[in-house]
Amino acid sequence: MQRLWIHLSFLFAVVTAWPEGLQAQVFVNASDAYNITQYNWDGHYGSGITLADWDNDGWPDLTFGATSGAIRTWRNLGGTGFEMIPLPWLSEGEIKALLWADFDNDGDDDLFVLEESGRCGFLEHNGEGGFQLVQNTKEGDSQLPQAETESGGASFGDMDGDGDLDLHICRYVEFSNFEEDGNRNVLLRNDGGFTFTNVTELSGIDVHMRLSFQSLWWDFNEDGHQDVLVINDKNGANSMFKNLGDGTFVDVAPILGSDIVIDAMTLSLGDFNGDGWQDLFHTNTHFGGDGLGSKLLVQHENGFFSEESANHNIALDEFCWGAAWMDVDNDTDLDLFVAEHDGLDPFGLNFLWENRVVENLATGQTSHLFEAFGEDVYGLDYLNSHVVASGDLDRNGWVDFVVHNVGNHKARIWMNGGFGNGHTSVTIGLHGIVSNPDAAGAKLTVHSSSASQSRIIHVGENYLSQESEYEVFGLGNDTSIDSVTVVWPSGLVEFFDPAAHELAPGGFYVLEEGSSLCTVTHQIQELCDFPSDVASHDGTGLFDVTWTQAGTLWEGLEEAPEWNTIDDAPWTMSLSWQDVSLCETTIGVAFYPLPGDLDTNGHVGVSDLFLVLEELGCMGTCNADLDNDHTVSIVDLMAFLASFGDTCGQ
C-alpha cells in the first residue's frame, strides 16, 4: 500500500463513542472498549511499544512487544476500533525495540525487532498489509549482529545524510570480563535493501562499555549532522555523541554538562519552557549517583545544559521508568507522563504532570512549574509500568497515550476526551523526499500568536518506545496559525504559509518535502525578437528572478530556467533542491518586431535594405510594408532608413 499524503485540511470528525458515564474523567482507559488485551507476563525491564501508523492511512496503529508468542499489531480502523494482526515473528525473549519506518525506501513501513538477548531482524511490508521475515539478517549478510548479549533499546537516524536510516543498538553490559565487541553499543550504516555495514569501531561510538538503556538521534548543535544520545544505568555517565560529519563521533557530554551519572531510565526530549531549545528529562531510582530523583537538563542558547529539576518542581524521588512529553490540555506547553515500578515495592502510582506557567508579580518574569493533574483528569491506577508512548488515536485533537506494564497488568490505552477549556490544536506529519521518507531528525515548528513550538521527529525515543509520527500541537485560544517551518534532514528549510496550504486549527496535515509554495517577484518582459529565435536560449540574462519565501531569500538553491517550446508559451522558471523541484513560476514574455529588421536577425542593416528595395512596388501582403498601407513605396523606404542601424535591446 502506498502512502497517503494529505495536503489539504479536514476537520477531526471521527470520535470514539463511549458508554454513558465514562466522560466524567478526562482520560479513560479504553483497552476493554477496544477489546485490546496485552500483557508482558514475564517481563524484565519492560517491552517496547509503538504508535506508528504502519499502513500510512493517517491513523496511528498500536504494536506491543512481549516475552513470548507472535508479535501482535492492532491496525487502527479510522478511530472506530482496532483490528488485531499477528506478525511473523515469534519472540524468544522480551522484546525491547519495536520500530516502524520505511527502511528500504520503497514507500511502505517495515518493522525492526530487537529482543533482550540481542536477537534482531526486520519484517518487510509488502505494501498490501502483509509481512515477511527478511532472510538476510544473519550476521555476515546484512551485518545485523546476533550476539547473545543483553540489550536495551534501539533507534534510527540518518548519520550520513544519504536519505536512509542507520541503526544504533544499546547493550546492557558493563563488566570488564565481557569486553568483547559484541557487548558494546552498535552502530550500523544502512546500505539499502535491508543490508547494513557495521561501523561501530570506525565511528568511535563504542568508546564506552556501559549499561545502556536507550538511544536517540538529535542534531543538538544544528550543524546538519544527526548526533546520538545514550542514557546509561548505574555507574556509567550519559553520553552525547557529536556527529563530525565524516563518519566519526566524539562524546561531548562532559563538555556540555549532560554527562550525569544516575540510574537513567528514559531519554525524553522536549522544549518544555518554549524557549526554542530542546530539553532532556531522565527518570531515576532511589539509588542514583548524581543525587536522588529525576533530572531535568535545561538546554541554553550556548548549547550547554544545567540540571534544574528542583527549580521546576519535578525532582521526583521514585523508582521510575519511561516518560513522555505531550501537551495533553492543548495550552501550548508540554506536560509530562512518568511511569513507575519499584521491584521491591510493586504496584506503583504513575504520574501525569501539568506544566504550569507561573508569573512572579514582583519581577514580571515567568517560570514553568509542574504539578500533578487531579483525579478528574487522570485517576489513580496502581501498576508495574515501564513504557509509554503518545499519539492522537481517535484524531479528536487531544493527545492520548498508551502504557505497557509487566506481570499481570494489561496495557492501558488512555483516551483523552478533552478538557472543555476551548483550546484547539493542529496535527502535522512529515514525509521526506530527499530526506529519509520518515523525516527522522527533522525539526518541525508551529508558530502562532501565543507560542512557537518545536518538535524533533524520532524513530526510537523515551524508553523502548516510538511515538506517533503525527505531532499534536496545542494552540490554546489561538484561532489561527502564523506559519509552519520545517528543517529537513537534507538541509532544506521550508516555510509553509497557512493561507496557501489551508493550515488551520483543528486540522490534520502531512507536509511533503519540497511542497511549500513560494512567491516570485518579476516583471513582464518585452523582447524585440521572435519565439523561434530565442527558443534555444537558456534564459540567462533575459530575466531577473528573485525567489522569496516568507520574506526570506532562498540561498544555495539551484535556479533552472527552461524554455517551453510550445508557440506563444511563457518562460518557466523552477527552483530545485538536490533534484527535487520546490517551486515553479511562469514569466510572461511580450515579443514585438524591431521595425525594419526584415530578416529578424536582431539588427537593421544592409541585408534588410536589399529586401526593401526588392519589394518596392509590392501591393497586398508585403514584408517591407512598414506603414501598413498594403503598398511598398518611398514612404516605407524613408521609414526604413529612419530605423537603419537599430539593434534589438538597444
Predicted regions and their residues:
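Blade-edge motifs of beta-propeller repeat domains
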Residues: 24-44, 75-93, 124-149, 186-210, ...
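Acidic carboxylate motifs that coordinate Ca2+ or other divalent cations, activating on Asp/Glu
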Residues: 57, 61, 106, 110, ...
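Hydrophobic beta-strand segments that make up the repeating blades of beta-propeller
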Residues: 59-66, 111-115, 167-171, 228-232, ...
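Beta-propeller blade termini
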Residues: 45-56, 75, 95-105, 124, ...
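Solvent-exposed segments in extracellular or luminal domains encompassing
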Residues: 559-570
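Gly/Ser/Thr/Pro-enriched helix-cap/hinge segments flanking short amphipathic alpha-helices
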Residues: 34, 38, 304, 359, ...
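Cellulosome-associated attachment modules in secreted, modular CAZymes
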Residues: 49, 583, 588-650
